[in-house]
Amino acid sequence: MSRISNLSLSHNQLRLAAFCMFILSISGCATSKSVQTAPPFPVHREPVLREKEIERNRFTVAQGEDVIGRPAVVRIEKDDTLPDIARHFSLGIKEISAANPKVDVWVPEAGERVVLPLSFILPDAPRKGIVVNLASMRLFQYKEDGTSLSVTTYPVGIGTDERPTPTGRMHVVRKAARPTWHVPSSIAADHRKKGDILPKTVPPGPENPLGEYALYLNKGSYLIHGTNKPASIGLTATNGCLRLYPENIKALFDDTPVKTPVLIVDQPYLVGQRNGVLYLEAHGPADESGALESEKLHKKLRAIEKQAARAIDWKKVKEVQAEARGIPVPIFESGRGTEMEAAKPVEVEHPETLYGKPEIPALKLHAWYVLAADVRDRIEARRLAAIINHQGPQIPARVFEKSESYRVIAGPFNDGGEAKEAAKRLKIDLEIDGIVIEPDKNG
């Protein structure tokens, strides 16, 4: 349990905090000073596109081609985080962090150019129904109207190493809007070990981890569903189900009939062509399968090289594999016209508002708070506040300076019950021993 204290903030301290605090964004695991990362390709010098002009979900698949979309870059603004950029552009957290390995995920520097990996190689699988590639943490839904093939793609959260998402053929057996979560006994046992007692069922609402929509598969108790933890999309964070952003699961739910086939594959190396250019997209494979997957890739590329009568740049292949940035990269040896053939990334304007970015309510004098941390490093404090801010459901948090330290304060909360529940969640989810701060009764 978290420590409960009668510590209180005075009226003057709260006023000082209101002036001194600066709101920041999400969780962190990077250097205190991020380094500018050059995109792995030249940026096309066109006028900057409006962000609505860049497609992120729906594409037409040209006959005989395997690559969709177009990479882009966007400049970071103050208080941005990569997870918020990722959600706005329908990317997963691992996708955007892998594409920008030297950019601080949670406290990037204003002015940095961030790669948006909005180009994808389709999985090597039948283009029918729903196909999910676990390695890229991405779902593809195919639709054919008799004359053309279209694909809609979304990032997904997948199972952990302990409870992985299974591969294989399945299909949708039923659909549910505002589903009730029937808590599996294994999950209840895991939570019980951490002091979190779950009910047998969780009704629809903000505490339901299934979100607002669910597609039930015929295999075991696996689902494709929404979430109340959007910052987990693009991570290995589920108990085996496939998890989508709330806005994406609604679109998928509306567009997916019962009996739709679902194929789940695990393909870390994707090879495809568009406009005569051969691309390789690499995602880090599991350690035990890395050598085998690399051998399969090289065998496939040697066959393509022989059939195309065009040399592959094997040094580039090695670089793409090693970096595993999840971005399609041309791998034919350079020749006249090669650069013109490859899809050029474009610069996109920064959105006025990032969709889904957590909002932090104003401080209230007579509210309850939780002191989550008191640290000497400003960046560390900002990261922690950001992590807390992106819990699901959200726990609002902010940082303000006190003497030579930085305090991370969660709140405001309406009453002691809310504050104590937030402190409990901080302990269970983040192993933070928070201190509940009562309102100043004299203020």
Where are the model-predicted features located?
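Short, surface-exposed ligand-recognition loops at beta-strand->loop->(often short) alpha-helix junctions
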Residues: 288, 371-380
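Extracytoplasmic
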Residues: 352-365, 376-443
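Cell wall/extracellular polymer interaction/catalysis modules
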Residues: 92-94, 98, 109-113, 117-169, ...
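Primarily N-terminal secretory
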Residues: 2-8, 29-76, 106-120, 295, ...
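Bacterial N-terminal signal peptides
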Residues: 17-26
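Exported/periplasmic cell-wall-interacting domains
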Residues: 38-40, 187-346
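LysM (lysin motif) carbohydrate-binding repeats in extracellular/periplasmic proteins that recognize
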Residues: 32-33, 37, 77-107, 149-152, ...
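Primarily a LysM-type cell-wall glycan-binding module
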Residues: 55-90, 375, 400, 404
